[in-house]
Amino acid sequence: MKRKVVFWGCGKIAREIYHKYKDMITLSYAISNDSRETLFVPEEGQEYPVKNPEKKGKGEAGMIVICSADYERIAEQLCLSGYVPFVDFMDYELAESLWTEKRIVLLYGSCHLRGIADCLKRAKEFSQGYAPIYYPNYLFLNFYQQGRLQYLIDHCGVFVYGMTVSRENYRKNRAILERLNPQVRTLCLQNICFGGYFPQKKRNYNKMNECAVKADRYDYTPFSYGDSWLNACIAEGIGLEDIYDAIERKEVYDRDFILKYMEGEWKRLKYQEEESDFRIVGFIEDNYRKRRLFRNETHMENIILYQYTAQVLQYLGCSTQIDAADAPLLNCSQHFIYPCVAKALELEWDVWQEELELYTYAGWEKVTIWEYIRRYYETCREIYYLKGKHMLP
């Protein structure tokens, strides 16, 4: 028996959902806030009327499926119109898992888990029987988000969660673990940071750069993660040419400090791994000299995410074949590696020639180490000045 549904949205997602599940659903019509949209044509020969949002009626048209990446805003609008989440409407991700009867793999934690969820979607054998859904543990949840998370907790078959030293994070994880059905399979992932490439004398892992402005809910604003040496230069009024000279002469950090710092990183990583169901430290030790493994202190390159994903797939008895991504799965800038650090760690690539992926408000750019430093200096010096004048929080 086909499911009777209404689509909220007439764009790319709605067309893709229709194309994939047209044999399983009966579409009554579509809804849009845009009064100019009057007809939804998912494919040639198929036309459906588009209506403006209305208050809840008898519900004879079927379950409303929100076919939009901005489903949270639309869900709020539906709630204000009298609709009940998961009774009268749900977003397309949940609808897909319901229609296909795939087992939900709930990934709960930081952006590391989001990257793994994206990788799992690229594993063909896994995708035949499982539906990965990521949920962040660091955002305030509104009414719909709380209900959605509860729905996922009650219906997931596998729960992969991130563990940190945060008391709040521990409390959230324990609350979910105690609510899970005993038959749900669980995997714990320690949220690792790696400062080996980026040693600093003043560091608070995963804290906002004191000389940057953070956009609400996002880490990938320009220079979100700070460089304490450059920040100190800015605070002391040291000019850009003097900064260039110090870096070129490899006078930023001495070799003993770099190696001692790296030794501390290995101890911390190995300690964290003891509490994790994943093994990654050995891979980092074997490969960190050969190629860049981390974009900045808290965000990894795709190759690390592939290693984590392969372990999830092995745990579930699936093929570890993953289609490689064309772009970084974690949206944050690559921080430069000081030449003195590259020399002390005996890195096998030339950091002078490395093209760094820099996020800007105009989009992504590839820049040299000198261009990165110049932009960091100019941007963060201005923000440092504005904060000093109490013109920014």
Report each predicted region and the residues it spans.
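Phosphate-bearing ligand-interacting subdomains
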Residues: S35-L98, G162-L180
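Short internal beta-strands
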Residues: S28-D34
